[in-house]
Amino acid sequence: MRYLDEVGLPHPCTRYAKIWNEIQEAVSYLGKPCYIKTDYGTASTGVWCIKNDHDLNFLKESLTAKGIINGQTEFLIQEASSGIFEQLHAIFDQGRLIAIHCTRRLKEGLGGGAIIKVGVDRPIVRKDLEKIGESLKWHGSLSMDYFYHEADDRAYYIDANPRITEPMNSVVNGINFAEMQIRLSLGKSIPTNYIDQITNKSHSTIQALLAAAGQRYSRLDVLKEMCLVATKKGIYKNSRESITPVAKDFPSIILLSAVLFQLLYNPRSGQMQAQKAISNYSLGTAIPKISGMKPEEYFGFNAKTNKNIS
């Protein structure tokens, strides 16, 4: 957020705190609802929505028990933003914006992720990203979350990831960020790529099933959602599968079936499955340590002795 202030890009009103009294003062200033965030997090972990005093007291107890309120960890307290939740996915070559694709969340899943999304055209976001790329001389991928205000055609940015995230809607709309990232890593030149057709939809059946199970812990809800997806009815009409496209990748039916049968056996397992998936790829508390590591330590290998670091 501080960087956004430096380059003059909008974001919801934000305060910073390291001790609980500062957090309370920030919440009082911003009002409720508001959000409290840790400096690092994945898939909305480390983010808490504070709607009332009970939420705030519960969070204090939780953070105190974890030893996080130690005067060292910085928290970001941010007002709840209005507008439409969207995401951008972009790739740069030494500061030059090569390609960008924006998506709107049509249906929310567990942890705030998108069950189904559609491509949208946001010239103002492209302009903002060109400014970021030039300022940082960014090289590689960048993804950001924002709330779009149609009234004044502005994007209010709330989160950033220095990587590719959920690229399949880009693919169904004509941009393959994964391929571009590989070409860029190999030092190949990539022309600027802007597309005209950006309104195709994509969805994740697994996300849909997990969310259906999490609402009322109902097997019937899970089956109903599976039928809607399979028959492409309702919001899933003209949408393409992004994770388990069984028609093109038949072995993916194994993963889909495993999730479906687990949820039918125990609908309450959905939240646990989602958390387990996040923990498998999240760097979590390791992130602050990375800046102090040597390159060979990233992979547990000592280049000088050719021995694994145990």
Where are these regions (language model features)?
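Glycine-rich phosphate/pyrophosphate-binding beta-alpha loops
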Residues: 44, 106-111, 116-117, 161-175
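Conserved N-proximal alpha/beta basic substrate-recognition cap immediately N-terminal to
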Residues: 1-21, 25
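Short glycine-enriched loop/turn motifs at secondary-structure junctions
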Residues: 8-11, 40-44, 111
